Amino acid sequence: MESTYELFRRGSALLESGDHHAAIVSLQRARELDPEPTSIREALGRALFHARRYEQARAEFEAVVERAPTNDYALFCLGRSLQQLGRHAEARRPLALAACLRPERGDYRLYRDRARAFAA
């Protein structure tokens, strides 16, 4: 039986290689073994997002933000997931927080501004 760490490493490698569906399988198994590490949940959220499974991605990024409320990347990805679900008004807050935490990130500002415009 593979350890949580081995599953996480394999899932992360698959994610980086672009095999999002295979990454999901490994990362979900890792999360089942240990649901606490935000690194596992963030990687799983990324894989789900790239596989266009936005509702599941949203749930993973939300779990990361609950544990690490200043994780700018998780906030950004939560906002992007909400945007992909058409929930633009809800996306405004996490995208605005991400942009405040990392003002040098132009992509954060771009999507924050899009959410503001779309929800207005």
Regions found by a protein language model. Name each.
Residues 1-4, 92-120:
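Terminal, low-structured helical/coil segments at or just beyond the last alpha-helical repeat
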Residues 17-29, 51-63, 85-97, 119-120:
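Structural signature of tandem alpha-helical TPR/SEL1-like repeats
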Residues 59-84:
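Mid-chain, well-packed structural core segment of small domains
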Residues 2-33:
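Alpha-helical segment of the N-proximal tetratricopeptide repeat
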